[in-house]
A protein has these predicted regions:
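Short, contiguous alpha-helical
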Residues: 1-15, 67-107
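Aromatic-glycine hotspot motif
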Residues: 6-71, 96, 109-116
Length: 116
């Protein structure tokens, strides 16, 4: 999920390449990576974003499996980045449930519901 956020910034918002080593082996290192990713997202200057460019310019996603084209940054976000985030979030949720961690739907969807 960290890479998805990072690559959104570089592929869609055209920020300079950002290197995250992908070699974390402890929870502390993973927590530091999460903090670094949040810092990257917070560093985006919202006033410099060109909504038309994000909405209209194609995005090429270069991967080891080949290159993939999205018609726009909006398409990249809605058809790849958000579904990829939810895939990994639900996978982690299912693994935790399988291992007996006492979590439920409200732990996953807690921010969606506002009790009245």
């Amino acid at each position: 999920m960290s890479n998805t956020a990072k690559f959104f910034c570089t592929r869609v918002l055209l920020l300079p390449d950002i290197t995250l080593d992908d070699n974390e082996s402890t929870f502390e290192e993973l927590q530091a990576r999460i903090t670094r990713t949040i810092d990257i997202l917070r560093s985006v200057d919202q006033s410099s974003l060109d909504a038309n460019k994000v909405a209209e310019d194609p995005v090429i996603m270069e991967t080891k499996m080949g290159n993939f084209r999205f018609e726009s940054g909006q398409t990249y976000l809605s058809e790849y980045a958000i579904p990829n985030f939810h895939f990994h979030m639900t996978s982690a949720y299912c693994i935790l449930r399988h291992l007996g961690v006492p979590i439920g739907a409200f732990d996953y969807l807690g921010d969606v519901f506002h009790k009245v």
